[in-house]
Amino acid sequence: MNKKKKPFLGMPAPLGYVPGLGRGATGFTTRSDIGPARDANDPVDDRHAPPGKRTVGDQMKKNQAADDDDEDLNDTNYDEFNGYAGSLFSSGPYEKDDEEADAIYAALDKRMDERRKERREQREKEEIEKYRMERPKIQQQFSDLKRKLAEVTEEEWLSIPEVGDARNKRQRNPRYEKLTPVPDSFFAKHLQTGENHTSVDPRQTQFGGLNTPYPGGLNTPYPGGMTPGLMTPGTGELDMRKIGQARNTLMDMRLSQVSDSVSGQTVVDPKGYLTDLNSMIPTHGGDINDIKKARLLLKSVRETNPHHPPAWIASARLEEVTGKLQVARNLIMKGTEMCPKSEDVWLEAARLQPGDTAKAVVAQAVRHLPQSVRIYIRAAELETDIRAKKRVLRKALEHVPNSVRLWKAAVELEEPEDARIMLSRAVECCPTSVELWLALARLETYENARKVLNKARENIPTDRHIWITAAKLEEANGNTQMVEKIIDRAITSLRANGVEINREQWIQDAEECDRAGSVATCQAVMRAVIGIGIEEEDRKHTWMEDADSCVAHNALECARAIYAYALQVFPSKKSVWLRAAYFEKNHGTRESLEALLQRAVAHCPKAEVLWLMGAKSKWLAGDVPAARSILALAFQANPNSEEIWLAAVKLESENNEYERARRLLAKARSSAPTARVFMKSVKLEWVLGNITAAQELCEEALRHYEDFPKLWMMKGQIEEQGELMERAREAYNQGLKKCPHSTPLWLLLSRLEEKIGQLTRARAILEKSRLKNPKNPGLWLESVRLEYRAGLKNIANTLMAKALQECPNSGILWSEAVFLEARPQRKTKSVDALKKCEHDPHVLLAVAKLFWSERKITKAREWFHRTVKIDSDLGDAWAFFYKFELQHGTEEQQEEVRKRCENAEPRHGELWCAVSKDITNWQRKIGEILVLVAARIKNTF
């Protein structure tokens, strides 16, 4: 019992108890406390009831309060102006009209409360600040003194006295000292256990004496009577420290002897002995009582059913887990006596026993179970010598010649020639094992392998692997014409034997053949099974999915076979030709791509994209005349095709044939006068420096296509390039009248006004653009950046908040919002952005830049990879990725990013378009533009 807590605390007071009466205090009672007189025989006693329930007066008040629910309509409760103090109809029903009236009054109260709410809150805030300035907190008053606490040293801290009234505490709270004699059992116990010091004094000499630390002292030559050195004999105590040292020495000697002996090599590992001991310690978290219960239950099971093998195995494993390995061994050996025909018991006994003993256990098991394959395998595993393993397995095969597992284990230990001989015998003993037949075929010569596979087909006519292996054998020996026949015969034979042709399994086999290098076999398998089990209307879709799956599994020849078969079935489908062409472009050679495109344009001459891909392939290879000839053929098939005209113009302009490009554009304007043709004509003259011709062509184009915004943009940019700001503004304004929903036109006009210093006008233009084009992220982004460039960061943040409310799923806005925040809040903002736009490339790019700014290189590289994977057309992502690798990557990584960018050929991105569409960079390649954009990036984010 706690000495401080009294036993009567928390108990009800005895009857008639008066507080303080024991120390002389006198209480008094009144009539209201006593209450009315009561009979002496009345058992009820309310003198100690809670307040408010003790007297009759309290009960009367309670009854009166219960009656107060009724309306008090007395004249004393009536006022001429306000009427009755309470509601006259409080007891009436609360109807819908009353609810509407209350709602109206509540709305009025709320409206009145909101009036001047901001002024009231501002006034209250100022009053609170004024009050805190006049009456600061104690914490604020001592803040300057608290700073000086940093100068206090550790010694000064320790010298500060404890807080408390220590004047006469002992006199006020006297505590009697208790003395208890030490029992004799205490001394006897410590005398028996040899209690003594276990620490060694650093001054101790070799024989136990102490070196006197002072110059004038003497070195004690011999140990004293009870010094930490050699213990004085005759004391009757034991030195436990020396006993432990002797035991460790003895253990080292035994381990050394064991490590030197050959027979103990597999029994004890001296270096790992302590590790083995630790592994024997039970690692479970169960209660010791649970172990005892389990032990009793298992004992009961063993006694009631001693011939039940799982009981013996479970008992042995329980003892093993608890660390009693020898008990476990004894139990399992007794289990082998009770269950000599149980394979599991013998295997468990062999597992628990050490090396040589385990061999003896297995030998005994073989005598009881001479047909057990698992015991023979365990016996072979226990042998360390290869010859001994072979001897065990051959002995096993004498007893169990039809075990495939034993044959496989024996063959794995043999040399190729001996293995071939053993497999010849194995297929005789196990004629239904496909693995043994195939292994024998792989070890035989070509002619013998064919004979082996023929015998295998006779013995196992329902297995497809034998047929596929035969096809691979013919392909490996150059008989590719036999591959197709073998696969066709396989399908026919398997169906004749009642085997269902599983299309997915055959496709997996074809992929394995592809990975093994058997191209002809995989293609033959694909052609044979690709159309099995598919509805006619689902063929195209299913085959395209199969091709994509093969590409994902890196089985390119299988995918090529699928495309070839699909093109035979659908020779006029442009989409199939395109998929096959893109496959060859990404995974094939230039020659295979061009050959495929030649076949494609022969079957689909109206497919412009196929002609253009062929011309581009020739042009990239440097064969410009071949590209021209392809485009000429394309003109014949598509005489008024805008795409082919523009491709021809680009081909000539890229090869500096400007006059030929002009003539082509002139012909195109006469035969196919489209807006894009006019735009390319204007741009050609513009980049060549013929500004007058460009302006004339632009005016002519606008007369025909005044609703084409890019023409108005080019007109304004040409004027802006010549420093003719008024004419540029007029061009943009005219363009916006014709194309009010063109975001780039609004941006160009706004930036023009900002460039000449008209910030207010630029802001007004953007506000007007947002009214005409609501929920436009590009316009909101430009508005935010305009304020940010002007130094008005608060207004920029406010606009960004409004923009995110209007366009909550805009990735470009969220990416900008991340870097508008202060550094500590950027990570939180990026999490919000990812929740809203998980797969937006701008948000992924912002996260990559965020990790880059925090110098988390690995994570930044991972997020850059995600960005370019999800949208390879975003040039800004490639530029930032390349800049990142320039600073933190190797030359190989930089080159990889550049090559991937060139293959992706990005066309979009704010920074990318600013460089790629610059007139001075019109002839630059993708790789050069990438370098220029990366050079413009300054990682100040």
UniProtKB/Swiss-Prot annotation:
GO BP annotations, alphabetical order: mRNA splicing, via spliceosome; positive regulation of transcription by RNA polymerase II; RNA localization; spliceosomal tri-snRNP complex assembly
HAT repeat locations: 384-416, 418-444, 445-476, 554-586, 588-620, 622-654, 689-721, 723-755, 855-887
Residues bearing the modification Phosphothreonine: 180, 266, 275
One GO location term (cellular component): nucleus
Alphabetized InterPro entries for the sequence: HAT, PRP1_N, Syf1-like, TPR-like_helical_dom_sf, TPR_rpt
Molecular function as annotated in GO: identical protein binding; protein-macromolecule adaptor activity; ribonucleoprotein complex binding; RNA binding
Protein name per the record: Pre-mRNA-processing factor 6
Organism of derivation: Rattus norvegicus (Rat)
